[in-house]
């Protein structure tokens, strides 16, 4: 992409679309024929992601002069500048788009009035844009965010109710406000207060234009900044420039369904404080509080400045600057960083004694040469100002400017110091100080670590070692990184798999080396991931006493007086039960990552999709509800699979078929949104992968249409489960049933009923077969029962379905096992059922053919206190409903009569019998189809259809799976329990 300069053309031609560009004559661009499109993006932005597509027109009648030497120019309107969040004279990257993507479908919103009038040729449109007169708004586009609206585009028009009609050009209101003109003596000595917000880079305070006018300050003026709290007397005021904060370029937001004209990027009364300045001020990065702003009145003017000029007062330059490199686990303190520091101080920097300076290292040659991978392993280096030498400045603190022209820089060694947190360009979830969905755990971890950082922390007894437990991918490392960033601690992450060795002595040496390295960069947190790998012998079966003794010594015998600043250890594990007891007791603090609630999953999804274009039909709240039981890693995998599904959809749609690599790149530059079908496909893939694990919860896809008959049974089940969900106020009255027991002959649809209830009520379904929980090891069976209920609580709202319950919970005292395993399993199951009263969104459904074999304690109130009999279908009407439900997806010949088929069947049939009937009929149809294909009597492309003959042949061979004597026995059992 070539570099170009944007120039505002005023007045902009009224006959030209406001989001088009005019090419002055003599420029390097090709002839602006009909249909020429340019892709624009700000020069400083990453080339990844979509660009803005604009129509390029010739501008010979605009009164412009011939293009001279220098960068090419693009003549634009102020509306386009606002969309790009740029000013006149800004640099952009532009390239000609040979084949802009053609839109296959577009949704237009219009108020009462005329619709879209006739157009000549295709029209370049963008999602969220208001088209020229008559002014419909583009609400949604497919497959790209922007493209050509032409004769091949299918249009859907809807009426905008209660929405303002937004126009891209609004006359004089689009002009920026005039700069403030305030005399310096008019506000001399005035102290103002602003609410601080962490963000921005450099050493400048970012404010809105209206806030700058309210403060009576000039753009780029120097001010003293200090905390407004009375208790913050330990930190001295700092110097900073005041800059107007301009909107940032984000095409996904500007082309969103609800996008509108850009306003101020920051509300009045707020100031965007850079992270380094906030750290040097001693502010809490999460609670900045109020800041006192006072104008820097007394300044110095350089003696070489002569003549009549107007300069804002500023701090003097330092003659000498003595700094120390801050020890960090990410870089060496012995390297030669003269070139890095020289390039950093080519721009004047504010320095004060005791400040921590952040020096970026991106693109520095010295950093690349010092890295064995030839890639930078860290984004910044930190230095601490030890001493400044210069003329005594006026003001509440000694603040200077330092640069390569006026200042001599001296490196005087290394030091131990906390460092500020710096925002990155990555996803807001991983780099956030308070990761969405994990805020409470971060606060809890900070509360454990913070006392050691207080002035009297060295006098505290004990250690601050923390054991963090949670399943894989739940965000343990993210939580530790956020806590370290919040407290200004260095983080040294060490996977315990890298500490394992052939002998105990080698493991001991590695452990001591890691702790020694961590002590050299205090205050720090040493993060040991998968700590359960330590303390095991080579076979992984026994415990290594020597390694455990060394680890306990390193964790517990740290002298707090000699460890200031402190070194704290956080260990993570996904299998706390495998952690040796001696290692676990060395951690006085234990934290567990809780299961994500629906609201937390929603906040994580919003953070992950913050910079992704989404279709208007995507409902993140509904998606979060369907992701019950997911951890942070699963939600990230969901976004990855959704993006892959969107790319596959675009390639298979025919739009990208046959295009060159350049054309596909232009399609990506236009941007394409993630649709609800992409998320649905990705969610299905993840749930299929999870279902391969034992007892993985998921929402089934069985509806009431798949369940024929059983109307009374459906009613009883819905009253038991759906009523508490729709009317939670009844729970305060104690009107809640814990469990539901379905009993009856085999094949009557008990499992299908439970799945249909889970689907219709949007509940997660956890199916458990009774025998699969029984284990040969002592205590393992009871643990399996506990894990089932723990997974259900994590995936709440959830239904636990116990199939073949009589094999899991028989009457106690009658089992023949010598160890009493079944009795203990029943006792554990009873204890878990009693604990469901505190969990309102977990329901238990059991299914059995023999309720008389169950332990009587299971049928008492508060457990399986609702018994529902699911019997066979004995009347033709119920059998017809079941048969219709089974065959509703089949292709039947018009001559097929299901009533006549049932007349040829035995009188008493279960749902499994009718399913067997349809299966046999389908097998007969397949055999007939194969025979016809071999004889050439039927084309291979014709659909397979069931005939009346196929169904009658299957009905003639059908035998009931439950005899009349067995049905009578089940009815006697039903009467027995109904009388109780």
From Swiss-Prot:
Changing residue 601 to Q: In HMLR2; uncertain significance; results in mild functional decrease in peroxisome biogenesis. ATP binds at residues 470-477, 744-751. One of its GO terms (biological process) is protein import into peroxisome matrix, receptor recycling. Keywords: Amelogenesis imperfecta, ATP-binding, Cell projection, Cytoplasm, Deafness, Disease variant, Hydrolase, Membrane, Methylation, Nucleotide-binding, Peroxisome, Peroxisome biogenesis, Peroxisome biogenesis disorder, Repeat, Zellweger syndrome. The keyword Hydrolase applies. The modification Omega-N-methylarginine is found at residue 119. Changing residue 413 to V: In PBD-CG4; disease phenotype includes hearing loss, visual impairment, enamel dysplasia microcephaly with deep white matter changes and developmental delay. It is an enzyme of class 3 (hydrolase). Expressed in the retina, at higher levels in the photoreceptor layer at the joint between the outer and inner segments. One of its GO terms (cellular component) is peroxisome. It is found in: Cytoplasm, Cytosol; Peroxisome membrane; Cell projection, Cilium, Photoreceptor outer segment. The keyword Ubl conjugation does not apply. It holds the Pfam family PEX6_vert_N. Component of the PEX1-PEX6 AAA ATPase complex, a protein dislocase complex that mediates the ATP-dependent extraction of the PEX5 receptor from peroxisomal membranes, an essential step for PEX5 recycling. Specifically recognizes PEX5 monoubiquitinated at 'Cys-11', and pulls it out of the peroxisome lumen through the PEX2-PEX10-PEX12 retrotranslocation channel. Extraction by the PEX1-PEX6 AAA ATPase complex is accompanied by unfolding of the TPR repeats and release of bound cargo from PEX5. It is linked to Peroxisome biogenesis disorder complementation group 4: A peroxisomal disorder arising from a failure of protein import into the peroxisomal membrane or matrix. The peroxisome biogenesis disorders (PBD group) are genetically heterogeneous with at least 14 distinct genetic groups as concluded from complementation studies. Include disorders are: Zellweger syndrome (ZWS), neonatal adrenoleukodystrophy (NALD), infantile Refsum disease (IRD), and classical rhizomelic chondrodysplasia punctata (RCDP). Interacts with PEX1; forming the PEX1-PEX6 AAA ATPase complex, which is composed of a heterohexamer formed by a trimer of PEX1-PEX6 dimers. Interacts with PEX26; interaction is direct and promotes recruitment to peroxisomal membranes. Interacts with ZFAND6. This is Peroxisomal ATPase PEX6. It comes from Homo sapiens. The lineage of its organism: Eukaryota, Metazoa, Chordata, Craniata, Vertebrata.
